[in-house]
Amino acid sequence: MRLVQLSRHSIAFPSPEGALREPNGLLALGGDLSPARLLMAYQRGIFPWFSPGDPILWWSPDPRAVLWPESLHISRSMKRFHKRSPYRVTMNYAFGQVIEGCASDREEGTWITRGVVEAYHRLHELGHAHSIEVWREDELVAGMYGVAQGTLFCGESMFSRMENASKTALLVFCEEFIGHAGKLIDCQVLNDHTASLGACEIPRRDYLNYLNQMRLGRLPNNFWVPRCLFSPQE
């Protein structure tokens, strides 16, 4: 297996089955972050991830981390917190602020460069990338964003600045997603945080099969319309 150099003149990707085993899932480098190429990548189960100053790297790891929304693990303490939550949760109210928050709230550095921010903002304007926002009064305290593929949502990143705020974002989104025929959330690579919330690993081949089925599914036409999903009890 060898790393494939992408052409700037074609948005085609090699098969994910040809990705390297070490580092796990590295498939190709180069190309660009145009909307057409990004959408082609997500349709093939591929995503970009690279450090500032490096070429664009494209990945499709095996196994793949996913979260079945109905399997989201919410602790008893979180359930109690949510019943009296001070947070308001919205969808697609402030995509730019969310991705900027994800880019800046990383002590260890971030792969979300200015070029990445601009690329996903273009996807948002085209109706493919979406955000969930958590507010404490008028302050944005957490958020997450990702790319929709039919009834599958490819989560990209999240940030949190207050207790339980990012968990609130995921909890409310999962409830809304399930309630409107959403099936699966792609978490890309498992980490301690996503594992604690119920994410698990499945073989890449299984993920690609789910993706090929679910990206042809449809959520209600108005699902991604900017709106409030949850308000604190008065």
Curated annotation (Swiss-Prot):
GO terms for cellular component: cytoplasm. Coiled coil: none annotated. GO terms for biological process: protein catabolic process. GO terms for molecular function: leucyl-tRNA--protein transferase activity. It is found in: Cytoplasm. It is an enzyme of class 2 (transferase). Keywords: Acyltransferase, Cytoplasm, Transferase. It catalyses: N-terminal L-lysyl-[protein] + L-leucyl-tRNA(Leu) = N-terminal L-leucyl-L-lysyl-[protein] + tRNA(Leu) + H(+); N-terminal L-arginyl-[protein] + L-leucyl-tRNA(Leu) = N-terminal L-leucyl-L-arginyl-[protein] + tRNA(Leu) + H(+); L-phenylalanyl-tRNA(Phe) + an N-terminal L-alpha-aminoacyl-[protein] = an N-terminal L-phenylalanyl-L-alpha-aminoacyl-[protein] + tRNA(Phe). Its EC number is 2.3.2.6. Pfam families: Leu_Phe_trans. InterPro entries: Acyl_CoA_acyltransferase, Leu/Phe-tRNA_Trfase, Leu/Phe-tRNA_Trfase_C, Leu/Phe-tRNA_Trfase_N. Belongs to the L/F-transferase family. Functions in the N-end rule pathway of protein degradation where it conjugates Leu, Phe and, less efficiently, Met from aminoacyl-tRNAs to the N-termini of proteins containing an N-terminal arginine or lysine. This is Leucyl/phenylalanyl-tRNA--protein transferase. It comes from Shigella flexneri serotype 5b (strain 8401). The gene is aat.
